């Protein structure tokens, strides 16, 4: 395999079937480039309390554990068409609350109350209509299906 260091590559039909990028992404010659961040990897944000600003350039899917109440700030590097999920797990105390800044749009304009149980898991499913309008749907209290 050869290494090419450049900031711009034009990929034409030239006998090259696939380009492989050092971030784990590929280009299959169909005009699409897949980078590691678009494959569905979940970026763990760790324990969170207070202001939380997510950098959407780093991934599309995120997880965090609430150790206190949070304010979900407007994300940085949001691109129209981007989408993903934010998994919110409560610590062993539970009963954490949240608020969100204006980019985050929810049905009816009112954020739902997060689950209150210790170790409860909620999911914020999001899609960026524009760089400053993020449509969200919150799924509360994720639990295994009964068998």
Task: Place the predicted regions along the sequence by residue.
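Intrinsic low-complexity, repeat-rich intrinsically disordered segments enriched
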Residues: 1-59
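Acidic, glycine/polar-enriched metal-coordinating patches/loops
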Residues: 64-147
């Amino acid at each position: 395999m050869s290494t090419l260091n450049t900031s711009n590559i034009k990929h034409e039909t030239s006998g090259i079937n696939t380009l492989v990028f050092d971030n784990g992404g590929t280009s299959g010659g169909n005009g699409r480039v897949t980078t590691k961040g678009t494959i569905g990897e979940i970026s763990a944000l760790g324990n969170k309390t207070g202001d939380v600003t997510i950098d959407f350039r780093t991934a599309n899917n995120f997880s965090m554990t609430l150790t206190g109440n949070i304010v979900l700030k407007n994300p940085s590097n949001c691109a129209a068409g981007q989408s993903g999920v934010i998994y919110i797990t409560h610590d062993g105390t539970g009963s954490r609350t949240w608020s969100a800044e204006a980019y985050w749009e929810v049905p009816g304009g009112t954020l739902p109350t997060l689950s209150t149980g210790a170790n409860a898991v909620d999911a914020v499913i999001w899609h960026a209509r524009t760089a400053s309008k993020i449509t969200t749907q919150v799924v509360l209290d994720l639990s295994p299906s009964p068998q």
